[in-house]
Design a protein with these regions (language model features):
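A short glycine-rich, Lys/Arg-flanked "PGG" loop and its adjoining helix->strand segment in the class I
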Residues: 364-380, 405
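A SAM-dependent methyltransferase catalytic signature shared across enzymes that methylate proteins
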Residues: 383, 401-413
Length: 490
């Protein structure tokens, strides 16, 4: 059984990434399907949880993802060269220069008393309405902002010219994720938070370099959405009760603008804590030997992995969720600040953007190519574990067909709870909560199977679901597992 320490390993909380899987749910797969010294790959590694767990269990890992932001997260996760004491010392220098700049932006003087705002409620047009601050006893209080002071601030903000660099990268138009025509990354921020982020970025560049700078930047990108216009208030809990950025770029009628210095310092503490946790695990102790395995972070297209045939002992992956999460389009908020450019044309995704030719047919073709690559690099009779969540039958068909076409034989399946859920899972009672986890074995023989077309599949699934409901299985998870049992038991 996993200990509470293992379940809450801080190394996996340094940065957001969609669909992050809980280590305690996937770590046992490494012991079950691989040996010490084996080579393990995740072609769509994302945050890199599985690969990190495998590395710490002395497997040689290949951490692959086409998204540069994912590569950067993995680089920080796996780095052993960070000097934490140096990071803390450099932060003192950065904070010394940043503090007055940020305080000038977030200090309000009301009735002769100065307040340092932690969070500010603003209308969509930008007018500040309320703010939170700490009292002398460290209690958080909420105060209204007089209209005259709010108007004066808006005039100051509008006239201000930002002298430090910031990205003005265009966001791909996609109404499904509220990415509208001519929207840029800069539009996701108020002038105040954009100026503060730009100043912080410049000071990181001034005072730090190497692995220490990377750790600052991982905290920086992790904090961007927290201090953007994307933070919604949870009105049922109070005007300044914060929600979290999940997906997309929707800006509500009101949003919460957070103090960049205050929130960055919190994110930096999490990054340092996560790094210390990782370094401690790598070093080992009396109960666990030092890690002696290797890792490699690659930016290959999953449809064309730069690996020899039959060179991998175990594959685990969580492939793209169809149109549920357009990873590259949403990662622009991170990639732009990191000055990284994704290869959008090679992404495996279903996108509702009319600027991209990424529909279900392209998705099915690309998924099949990536699974063919998994088959090519995986040794005969070795194992491949797959997690997938999608409410679309067509996307599940694409995944299933790719497994069939490549002669992967199911040996096990179960339900896996996620560490983080997409909004549709959180907000819909009838949504699937978590992912199907299926493990396949590669058989060397070629396969020649006839598969049903889309209309036949739809009718078969509808009939099967109707029968399951008649039998008393009414929750979505139960129906999904019944489908798995019907189709995949060997």
């Amino acid at each position: 059984m996993k200990t509470m320490k293992e379940k809450t390993a801080s190394r996996y909380f340094m940065h957001k990434y969609w669909g992050k899987k809980p280590a305690e749910g996937i770590s046992p797969l490494i012991d079950k399907y691989s040996e010490v010294g084996d080579t393990v790959i995740d072609p769509f590694s994302g945050y890199g949880v599985l690969c990190c767990e495998a590395f710490l269990k002395n497997r040689n890992v290949i951490v692959n993802d086409l998204n540069p932001a994912a590569n950067f997260i993995a680089k920080n996760l796996f780095s052993k060269d960070v000097n934490i004491a140096k990071v803390k010392k450099e932060w003192e220098s950065i904070k010394k220069e940043l503090k007055d700049f940020v305080n000038d932006w977030y200090t309000l003087k009301i009735d002769g008393i100065e307040y340092s705002a932690i969070s500010v409620l603003r209308t969509k047009s930008g007018l500040p309405i309320q703010f939170t601050y700490k009292t002398a006893s460290r209690k958080t209080e909420v105060m209204d902002i007089p209209r005259s002071i709010a108007t004066e601030f808006c005039e100051k903000e509008e006239k201000y010219k930002i002298s430090d660099w910031y990205p003005n990268v265009s966001i791909i138009e996609n109404s499904r994720i509220s990415a509208y025509p001519n929207m840029t990354v800069a539009d996701l921020f108020t002038k105040r938070t954009l100026a503060c982020h730009a100043k912080l970025y410049a000071l990181i560049d001034k005072f730090s370099e190497g692995a220490e700078k990377d750790l600052f930047l991982i905290a920086f990108t992790a904090n961007l959405a927290n201090c953007s216009r994307l933070v919604p208030p949870i009105k049922s809990r109070g005007a300044l009760a914060q929600g979290a950025w999940m997906t997309g770029f929707y800006i509500g009628e009101t949003f919460i603008e957070n103090n960049v210095l205050h929130y960055f310092e919190n994110r930096l503490s999490k990054a340092i804590k996560g790094k210390e946790n990782y370094l401690s695990e790598v070093a080992g102790d009396l109960m666990k030997p030092e890690v002696s395995s290797t890792f490699r972070i690659t930016n290959d297209d999953a449809k064309s992995l730069n690996l020899p045939d039959n060179s991998v002992d175990y594959v685990f992956t969580d492939p793209p969720y169809g149109d549920s999460v357009p990873y590259f389009e949403q990662s622009v908020i991170w990639n732009a600040w990191l000055r990284l450019e994704p290869k959008y044309t090679d992404e495996i995704v279903i996108s509702d953007s009319n600027k991209r030719s990424k529909g279900i047919n392209e998705f099915e073709n690309d998924i099949n190519k990536s699974f063919s690559e998994i088959r090519r690099v995986l040794k005969d009779n070795k194992f491949f574990s797959l997690t997938f969540h999608s409410l679309s039958g067509m996307e599940w068909k694409a995944i299933s067909n790719a497994c069939v076409f490549n002669n992967f034989i199911v040996v096990d399946y179960e339900w896996l709870e996620q560490k983080t859920y997409p909004p549709r899972q959180l907000n819909r009672l009838k949504s699937i909560k978590g992912d199907v986890l299926v493990t396949f074995q590669k058989k060397p023989e070629a396969v020649f199977l006839k598969v049903c077309d889309d209309l036949q599949l739809i009718e078969l699934v509808k009939d099967f679901i109707t029968k399951q409901i008649q039998l008393g299985i009414v929750d979505t998870n139960g129906i999904m597992m019944a489908i798995m049992e019907c189709n995949y038991v060997v």
